[in-house]
Every structure is written in C-alpha cells, then in structure tokens.
Amino acid sequence: MTCDRMENMLKYPKEVNVMKDIPMFTTEFGVASLVLKEVPYRQEAYIRVRDVQPGQLRELLGECISFCRMVGAERVYATGHDELENSAYYGSVIQMRGEIQADGSLVENLFPVTEQTVSGWREICNDRLRDVDFAATLTAADESMILSSGGAYFIHRQGELLGAGWLEDGKLLLLCAVLPGAGERVMHTLLSLTDGAPLELEVASSNLRAIRLYERLGLIRTKEITKWYKIF
C-alpha cells in the first residue's frame, strides 16, 4: 500500500456519533421506517413506507423528509409504495447467485481479521466503498459481529495488500480492492474458501464494474430486492 493511499484512508473519519434507525416512524398520514445510520457518514437517509392512509403518501413522505433533514440528511431516498414510481428512480439492490470455482492461478494469500486488525480492516472497507451506492458504513459497534462471523479477510500478494472481503454462510457480504484492477484476484481468493458451493451476493445496480465481474465469473441476476427513488 502506498503512502498516498494510506493517507487517503486516514482522512476518512474514524468515528462519528452513531445515529440509530427508527423502525416505526408514526404520523397521522401513515407509518414508515427511517434508516438513519448513514446520515453521519454520507448525509443520506432512507425511507421504507410501511403503511399509508389513502391519498396521503405525499404528506407522509413530507413528515419523513422533514425529520431526516432535521438530523442532517442532505439526500433522502424512499421505497415501498407504487406511487413512488412518479419520483426520480435512483437505483436498485440486485441479488446475484451462482456456483463458480476459483481459478487457482488467481488465488492469493488470505489473512483472517483479528481483534488487533478488525478496526483497520473496517476503515479500509469504508474508504474503498464510500462512493458505492447502498454500501453500509461499518462502525466500531459492528466489530464483534465481524469477528464472530469468522469470514472477514485481508487478501495479500507477495506482501502487498490487494483488498478485503467478507464471506458468511454462502453469502459474499463485502468485497473491495485496494489496488486498481485487483478485484478479480480478491474475488478468486475468496472463492477458494467456498469449494464451488453456491454463492449469493447483493450489489447496487449502479455498480456496473462489479456486476460485469460477477457475470463474467458466472453469477446471474436473480432478483431486484429493493428499488429506491430520490425524493429529496
């Protein structure tokens, strides 16, 4: 890893005040879930419409937007109601699945994340994924979950960090490359742990580079999990 790359990573805020989601935000117009944990990091909030009075979607969203803005959101997205199709489509979360084998010529060295390295692993992942739509920011509160999963790794080649990844129960939860063009080697190195078993992952529709890689390896799109619309 170069000094410039390390310097850029250290510019990412190590910790800010954690903001909790609101599972049931109730108004006279209906109920929604407010996803607020990304507000301190990305200034983004997400609204999942749960229930709405007839003809009152705009009013419900107005209440939600006002609250999200009050806590610092500069961009607000929503899902969960057919009438949202009248708003500007922003992007989707897509599920992909397949059975693929690792290419042994592209498999590098895996180093499991430990208590001593989990904070650095998390910061690297946050830095590399900060501009990827719908990528959740990992906080210090997530470290115990990361460690207990036993599936978080650094990937190295000849002593140089290529990237990081996280596998759990047949799901690829996270993949990021530190070096340009290293994504395929990082992916094959993680695949070496699956022994050809079915693999599932979720990816943003806007992350075309990742989708092309996954499709080239043999994964197929199986479901549009969530469709998001920009409402502020």
What residue ranges belong to the model's regions?
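Short amphipathic alpha-helix that is part of the acyltransferase structural core
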Residues: 2-19, 103-136
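Acyl-donor-binding surface of acyltransferase catalytic domains
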Residues: 3, 7-11, 49-109, 225-230
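Conserved acetyl-CoA-binding loop-helix of GNAT-fold acetyltransferases
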Residues: 54-66, 179-194, 211-216
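Alpha-helix C-terminal capping segments
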Residues: 75-78, 84-85, 146-148, 165-167, ...
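A mid-sequence, solvent-exposed acidic-amphipathic segment
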Residues: 128-171
